[in-house]
Amino acid sequence: MSQLRWWVVSQLLLLIVVCILDHSEGARVCPKIVPGLDKLRVGVDITKLDLLPLFDLGDNGFRSAVADYTCDRGQTTVVDGESFDVPDQVDSVVIESSGQQTSSVTTIKSESQISQALSISAGISVDTAKAGFSSSASYAEMQEAITKYGRTVSQMSAVYTTCSANLSPNLLLGQNPLQTLSRLPSDFTADTEGYYDFIKTYGTHYFNKGKLGGMFLFTSETDMSYFQNKNSQQVEANIKATFASILSTETGGSSDQSKEVIEFKESSLITAKFFGGRTNLAADGLTKWQPTIAKLPYFMSGTLSTISSLIADTTKRASMELAVKNYLLKAKVANLDRLTYIRLNSWTVGHNELRDLSAQLQNLKKKTIFSDEDEKLLQSIEDQVSVPAWFSDRTTFCFRSTAVGSADQCNGQSTSTLCAEPNRYTQQYMDKTYLGDTGCRLVWKLSTTESSDWFKSVKVNFRWYPTWSPCACGPVGTPFTISAPANSWTQDYLDVTNPKFGECMLQWMIEVPPTATLWAKNLEFCIDFTCGKKKQCVDANHWTEPYLDISAHEACGMSWALIAK
């Protein structure tokens, strides 16, 4: 009975296709479409989408057409003095001639922020973004820059919009994808390869809205050391100045030779690219390049819809949605496999566990359909090797000093609190206890607004002992240790080191419990002190080398950092 039902359904589908083909034969073909609108009717593989690629070579994620354009209505519009056809399937077209619009600075400090940043221009939801872009060349480049080399990626652009368009909400699948779909069974599990071939040909999504024009894109990968002793406003101002300098240089203008721009360039790997128009004319100036954009526009951004939403057959639509879900999971496996390989070559703790995870990923690579247990396994692997957003975006390491007497001894303030996100040093605390005898009370804290349960057992540890005088910080040679769990300040340490009271040895450690995930066990704690040019990083659960706090006759700059590798 089921075979008979399937035969009847398949014949009906073929009849529908034939009817559509017969109808389309009489449709007026669009002889000259508005430049750039072809991109709105093609499919997109969300896992490989690379709208603004850092490299010219590679797959940009665009696929074959999912809709057919016809021009029965005869609608036209003028672009740069020339008439062009507006397809019936395009709901609205707005021809623009805006001047340069400069974007704000986008900063990507963690892997969790890569998809989020790339999704902004593509106009997709956060849930889809988690699996999106991970197979693109730009994603892989940013991932390596952040996770392998500890760099921060920043982007900024100058945009010249020439056209924006929306597809009709009543868009229908085109002849070719409809024919391909008609040959597929209603059940995804009956022909998984057939459904995957459809996705490989037509993609997972299409743009129902788009913005076209020209763009100059600036991307920098900046060493962590650059951000030391600079606040976010200073960093952003320097990025903007460097962007403006490079845009000026690329378009035949002069270069900014200020020390801020030079310093940023020396600390960064910079990529600058033009999109749209005759890019070979850009070096002759914006006045040469900009007029060529309207007829040679680039698809800069848009809003995505799923191709499955165009499938009229509810059963096949559900099967296509299931196929896309599994296709995205396959991309997630590939991404985690790449990330695990990076971890094996950069982490110092947990190599045996990483090899086990890698073996599990090799088995998952063979899957065509993922079970609920497979999804749980994937999530558990991700939890081990990927630094979560709650840590990279919402966690801080803080230091606070409180003057007991004169504020001159303690950073020049009665109370000073200095905090930094992971992979950033705190701003310098200037230790000047040699200026008095009352000293400064010092405390440290690791804070987060959300976390896994095990993180509550992570501790900040600090210990000290005097070298020759018990007046400085207690009995000579006897170490004192204070510690505090996450979201709590340590007890006060009274710093009265000076030539009168003596010197103290200081050490710090981040203590991570055995129940923690692998990424946390590979955290590093770093110190950078100007006195003695003391700069070092140690793994979690290890003390820093002793630092001799002399506080004799000069101020000592002190900074701390928590590094997620």
From Swiss-Prot:
GO terms for cellular component: extracellular region; membrane; other organism cell membrane. Keywords: Disulfide bond, Enterotoxin, Glycoprotein, Hemagglutinin, Lipoprotein, Membrane, Neurotoxin, Secreted, Signal, Storage protein, Target cell membrane, Target membrane, Toxin. Transmembrane segments: none annotated. One of its GO terms (biological process) is defense response to virus. InterPro entries: MACPF, MACPF_CS, Perforin-1_pore-forming. Its main location: secreted. One of its GO terms (molecular function) is wide pore channel activity. Glycosylated. Contains four O-linked and one N-linked oligosaccharide bonds. The protein contains 2.5% of carbohydrates (high levels of mannose, galactose, and NAcGlucosamine, and small amounts of NacGalactosamine). PV2 is a very high density lipoprotein (VHDL). It contains 3.75% of lipids. The major lipid classes are free sterols and phospholipids and also have significant quantities of energy-providing triacylglycerides and free fatty acids. Produced by albumen secretory cells. Found in developing eggs. Residues 1-26 form the signal peptide. It comes from the Eukaryota. It is found in: Secreted; Target cell membrane. Residues 27-340 form the MACPF domain. Perivitellin-2 is a heterooctamer of 4 identical 98 kDa heterodimers, each composed of one 31 kDa and one 67 kDa subunits. The 98 kDa heterodimer subunits are held together by disulfide bridges while the heterodimers are assembled into the native perivitellin-2 octamer by non-covalent forces. The egg defensive protein perivitellin-2 is a pore-forming two-subunit glycoprotein that affects both the nervous and digestive systems of mammals. In addition, it is a source of both structural and energetic molecules during embryonic development. The tachylectin subunit (31 kDa) binds target membranes while the MACPF subunit (67 kDa) disrupts lipid bilayers forming large pores altering the plasma membrance conductance. Both in vivo and in vitro, the protein shows wide pH range stability and is resistant to enzymatic proteolysis from gastrointestinal environments. This is Perivitellin-2 67 kDa subunit. It comes from Pomacea canaliculata (Golden apple snail).
